[in-house]
């Protein structure tokens, strides 16, 4: 429905199964009572379900993002209702069908086929106890405002403009490989995609030359063809928005370093793979989230300057640092980068075993791991005199 290359779609389904297996194996441990020694004869912490959880989910990973929420929420004893993006209703119906096929009781997971204008009404419903939203920052703010007015718990996973810092001592062959995977997965339509490549100026030209050669190996084409690595964008409107952001960035002084070929029919949603260089703060490619196959290259005088540029963003979802000095990379990832995840010498991605969430305008709360399942439970103190 949204144009994902078929092999990437199959991988998404496998990952969705993985998160279900992960919580089936680990939820009993995560949710078991935790004894705490106090003056009482007995005291412990119990984890009880909240009730109905309302999920508002996007189109870009239409299976994974639902199961990422649903597996922990439902195994903790909650009920799920889903408002999926209108352009992936086939996925929404398929997910509901899966829950009807397995051993869950009837109606513990239902798909609401409603417009976005009805979301506030659902949030206000007294049966809804909490909300999980994955989407744009503007959508997150609107949901948080409404949920706040009725004091309901929210977990928000919003937009990102992930910086990838490349230091002069990095292995450029391995680094460019990771950077390209981080940028072009799902045709660049990912909140945790690499959006800003911040390169020490002494190696900037080498980085550009190597990554462009690797881009030439990408296959733009039919998403049903297993050879395809770059499919169409989700819509012509999304393509046109990205084109406009690229144009404004170039008009502001950035240079167009590379542009790939796309299918010749103009009435399609394909966007070329574009490499912009000499991108500066104040340009859309630096300040905004570019949701598509555009690489924005930014020059940094040195490591300290690169860190400043990386954090010069309203977003804080993921970040990566590439260096041969592993201890320094760990220090920067842990203590310097303002993000919910800091990766060293690899591209940012989610994993059921690790918490996933952002800071700043990338949202709040966590999904996945032991932390994610605790977002939608009542962490209850039990005290016996």
Where do the protein language model's features map onto the residues?
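N-terminal Rossmann-like NAD(P)+-binding subdomain of aldehyde/semialdehyde dehydrogenases
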Residues: 1-41
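Residue-level signal for inorganic ion chemistry
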Residues: 20, 77, 109, 131, ...
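Conserved residues at the C-terminal ends of beta-strands
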Residues: 26, 56, 115, 134, ...
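Rossmann-like NAD(P) dinucleotide-binding subdomain of oxidoreductase/dehydrogenase enzymes
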Residues: 32, 36-174, 300
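Structural detector of well-ordered beta-strand residues that form the stable sheet scaffold
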Residues: 74, 81, 110, 155, ...
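Conserved C-terminal structural/oligomerization subdomain of aldehyde/semialdehyde dehydrogenase
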Residues: 128, 165, 219, 263, ...
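ALDH superfamily catalytic-core signature
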Residues: 130, 138-280, 344
């Amino acid at each position: 429905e949204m144009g994902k290359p078929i092999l990437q779609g199959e991988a998404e389904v496998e990952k969705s199964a993985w998160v279900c297996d992960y919580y089936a194996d680990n939820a009993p441990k995560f949710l078991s009572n935790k004894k705490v020694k106090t003056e009482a004869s007995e005291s412990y912490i119990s984890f009880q379900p909240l009730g109905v959880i309302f999920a508002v989910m996007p189109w870009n990973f239409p299976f994974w993002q639902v199961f990422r929420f649903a597996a922990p929420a439902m195994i903790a004893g909650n009920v799920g209702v889903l408002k999926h993006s209108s352009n992936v209703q086939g996925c929404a119906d398929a997910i509901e069908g899966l829950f009807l096929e397995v051993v869950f009781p009837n109606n513990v997971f239902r798909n609401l086929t409603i417009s976005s204008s009805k979301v506030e009404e659902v949030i206000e419903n007294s049966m809804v106890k909490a909300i999980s939203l994955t989407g744009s920052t503007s959508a997150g703010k609107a949901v948080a405002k409404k949920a706040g007015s009725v004091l309901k718990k929210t977990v928000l996973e919003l937009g990102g403009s992930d910086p990838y810092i490349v230091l002069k001592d990095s292995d450029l062959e391995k680094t460019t490989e990771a950077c390209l995977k981080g940028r072009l997965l799902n045709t660049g339509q990912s909140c945790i995609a690499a959006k800003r490549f911040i390169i020490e100026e002494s190696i900037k030209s080498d980085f550009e030359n190597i990554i462009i050669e690797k881009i030439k190996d990408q296959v733009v084409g039919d998403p049903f063809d297993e050879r395809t690595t770059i499919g169409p964008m989700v819509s012509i409107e999304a393509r046109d928005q990205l084109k406009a952001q690229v144009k404004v960035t170039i008009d502001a002084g950035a240079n167009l370093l590379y542009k790939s070929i796309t299918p010749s029919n103009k009435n399609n949603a394909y966007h070329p793979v574009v490499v912009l260089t000499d991108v500066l703060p104040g340009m859309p490619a630096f300040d905004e989230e570019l949701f598509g196959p555009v690489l924005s290259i930014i020059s940094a005088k040195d490591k300290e300057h690169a860190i400043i540029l990386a954090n010069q963003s309203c977003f804080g979802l993921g970040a990566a640092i590439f260096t041969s000095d592993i201890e320094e990379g760990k220090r920067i990832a842990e203590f310097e980068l303002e993000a919910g995840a800091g990766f060293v010498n690899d591209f940012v991605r989610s994993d059921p075993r690790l918490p996933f969430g952002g800071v700043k305008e990338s949202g709040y709360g966590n999904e996945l791991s032991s932390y994610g399942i605790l977002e939608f439970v009542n962490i209850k103190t039990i005290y016996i005199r």
